[in-house]
Amino acid sequence: MTPPPASPSKKAKSSWLLIALIAVIIGIILCAGVITFLTLFNKNGDGPDMDWQNATEVPLTTTSKATVSTTTTQSATTPSTTTTRIEETTTTTSGAFDESVKNSEASTSTIPTTEAVPTTTATDAPEIVMPVDVASILKDKTKDFEIVEKCAEIQALPVSCTPSQSPLTSDPSKFQPIHYVLNITIRDVRKPVLEGHMQLFASTKDQVQAISLHSVKIHNLENRDRIHVVNCNTGETICVSRVHQIDDLIHLELAQSISSGVNLRVDIDGFISADSGPHVFKQIPTAKWRVPQMIGSVFEPTSARHVFPSFDLHNQKSTFNLCLNHGPSMSAIANSLINPNVSTSGISCFEKTVPLIAQQLSFVAFEKTNPLFYNTTTMDGAYLPEIDMIFNLNAKNFKQYEWIHSEVSKVMALMSKWSGFSYPLTRLEIVVAPVQAGHSALGVITLPAQAIAYQKHTSTHETLIKEVIGQWMEGVVTTEHTCFEKALIAYVEWKINEELQIVKKTRKMEVSKIRPRNLNETADSVRVLRQIKSQSSNLCSPRFVEVFYTLDETYGQETVIGMIRVIFDKFAFSTATISDWASAAETATGGRPEAGALIHQWYRPSSTISRPVLRAVVSSNSVEFNQLTEETWTVPLEISGSAGTQLAVISEKKQAIPFVSSDYVVVDAGRKSHAFVVYDADTYLRLIRCFGDSRCPSKEIGGIFSDLGAALLANILPKPENQDVAKWKSVFKFMAQQNIVEGTAACCVEHAIREMRKCSYWDIQDVCTKIDFNIVLAAVA
């Protein structure tokens, strides 16, 4: 009997089973291939399972919109905590980086860095700037630290002696401070009254018989029983025979002469500062104004001497150990972290600082305030420290202040990159306080509360940027010439704003604002530079900023950045001179000596007209320059014409530069130079035609005529020859018609051509009639 044929349903089922079996086999083969590939991939150390903890390089993960988890807490002195998440564009590293940061603080070994791998875009990945090894940089200070430790153990013995017949004096510049152990007690916040005692370790740089310290209105110093001097080299206690004050110096007369190179310890007990004025800020809560009580320092040059006796010169750096007795209701911050092993309730003692000048010492005591705290992270490859923000208000809306952290982080990342020197501390304190102007001391930034309240104001962001720059340009490297320091900070702020567009302005725009309309006058120095009128007897001129613009525009946009890198490589935690910066300028420009001369001459004491003014006479085959000022300057200038642009260096009183052009010739056509250039009458007449000509090598002819007005007011122009009077009147008539100059300059231009439409009687009588150039022109009908 034949079996019946299989049913159609069973055939279909067998087909599906066969297909499934084939699919499983193919899947197994594919899985085996993937596993084999991943195994080989990981052996090369490039796969996602790479052992980051044992890697020889720090792996980077770059994201266009990375989420940084940031803990926002009250400081250790307050119990409550809140947490917020902040979205930032940042370059993050793995946890291995955080571990390397901790290791760098405990070891002097350097941290291996990686070169960023270029992305598929045209922009290269950011340069990696790792935390600096502070211990390695300060290794040459080890001997000083040993001197302090040994000398601190020497007991000062009671000694007696008779005063000399005539008072003896010395000078603070004959000493180099090594270390301060400073204890300050806040006796009264309202006045304020500060009491203190200190140990000062210093070495002599010359033979002396008196120790001279800066001290202004500090009481209890006249009692010599409160002062002891120890010779650290011999262990001997040196008798202080007399203490007397002359002007801003307290002189401690010694019973014996001390030779150069001797290490001394000066103990001063119970001094009182009751007149610290603008050098210490305070905030007192009232029934209507419920704010945290605060008191803190905002030291400008010569401020420290109002609070404690000190060597208060700009080139006298030393380390500090500060203890602040503020009472149990308050907390405190300073340049360095609190030392928990020494601090107690009501007394905050801080770790030893890196070397600082006296004006860089900073402390703030406060109560009942709400801080914001941000953990260590990175941005664009740069290390960012912990950032602790303290406010003078009991604010509850944390997010309204997050922009401060965002801007600070961006500027710190850029400063790390430009200087090649990462922020050297583990924490930055930012204090919003009732102060007149911003202040920067290494580790502490103090911001004016009134400015921070108005985030949309341009000056608010300018202040913040300058104070962050000050962490590097004043804190890490100090320059003896304070005006150089302030001017460089102002210029770097302009460059940073061009880069980050925090404030929409350009360097060219800012230089144009401060370029004088009268060579005998300058712009508002307080607006441009970071300084306080009430605290500065000699304000710095804004003209000091211009030289950096000249360097960048003449020799390349990386010139000033190159100078900064050279200085930070050589002078971190020490003081640089103008000569050091001049040498750095020469190095940054590839060995051009005129760049160094530019720095030297720009910061030398000058006559009334403190910039180069040159008269250019254009002929068919050359341009002849005559310097019109008393001083001779070295001036790099571009000469532009039909054949192109040529860079010339003018270094003599009278100098001819070969130059041929078939049409117009313009010196400094791009307005790059800090120098003023005036011309002969024939050249000005040609420049009038150049004014609207597309072939003109300069688009800023108006500025050239404006400079003529400034030179006219300064009475520096040579008297015109009789045959040129008509030409000059044509030039001045053009200036008046085009309204190129304004104010007194416009009046004197009109006076020269007898068309005084806008002139006041006093301008004519007091200024215009006394200008030699005008006397000649006005005398001719």
Swiss-Prot record:
Residues 1-27 form the signal peptide. Disulfide bonds: none annotated. One of its GO terms (cellular component) is membrane. The keyword Ribonucleoprotein does not apply. Glycans are attached at residues 54, 183, 341, 375, 520. Coiled coil: none annotated. Residues 63-113 are annotated as: Disordered. InterPro entries: Aminopeptidase_N-like_N, Aminopeptidase_N-like_N_sf, Peptidase_M1_aminopeptidases, Peptidase_M4/M1_CTD_sf. Residues 63-94 have a biased composition (Low complexity). The keyword Transmembrane helix does not apply. Keywords: Glycoprotein, Signal. PANTHER family: PROTEASE M1 ZINC METALLOPROTEASE, THYROTROPIN-RELEASING HORMONE-DEGRADING ECTOENZYME. This is Matrix non-peptidase homolog 1. The gene is mnp-1.
